[in-house]
Amino acid sequence: GAVWGAIPGLLKAFRNLNEMIIGILLNYVALLFMGYLYAGPLMEANIPQTAAIEPADRLSRILPPTRVHAGILIALAVLILIYYYLYNTASGFRLRVVGNNPVAALVNGLPVKRMTVISFVASGAISGLGGAVEVLGVSYRLMGGFGAGFGFDGVAIALIGQLNPIGTGFVAYLFAVLRVGANTMQVGAGIPSAIVDVVQAIIIIFAVAAMGLV
């Protein structure tokens, strides 16, 4: 994750390319490369997926018989650490300055390019940690469709959460409830799970409008 995150970071810092576009394009490259792995050298028998992770290596469930596992604790810990770093440390303040106004940061002598790359590397590492939690706590293997839509959901969640770690956490929980609820409604009531995409789109439109971006 850190290595993958460094690519848009370097392109943003030294070529001033749009990190959003580069990130989206790299998502497709990563998905195709992952597909090569679980359908090629890591394939289990003749099924396009990797072998299942041993039960002893999986994240334990903390609220049996539900599927809630220790990954939620990891997510909360990362959320708190990021918030503390950004809003209670000098380097976190400098990083926010670079993100909000790189020109002003450069004028004041901050190493904008270096901090930009570091922030992308850290972001990629956290994304990789999220993927590891998903594998170790939910799917237990790599298979087709893994991670599909996560990147776009992440962009929407960060936007609605106004790039604040705490706000992002609450919005992520809301989106998770919508996703799980949609699957339950489809099984129990026959309501198409795609309805959640409509609901999320409406939420995003209103959130962006409230921020004055449209």
Language model segments and positions:
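Transmembrane-helix boundary motif in ABC transporter permease subunits
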Residues: 1-17
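Alpha-helical transmembrane segments of multi-pass membrane proteins, especially transporters
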Residues: 1, 19-27, 115-123, 145-149, ...
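Cytosolic-side transmembrane-helix boundaries in multi-pass membrane proteins
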Residues: 107-114, 180-214
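Helix-loop-helix "hairpin" substructures at the membrane interface of multi-pass membrane proteins
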Residues: 3, 65-141, 165-166, 170
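Helix-capping/transition residues at the boundaries of transmembrane alpha-helices
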Residues: 12-14, 86, 160
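Hydrophobic alpha-helical segments embedded in the membrane of multi-pass proteins
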Residues: 2-6, 25-28, 76, 128, ...
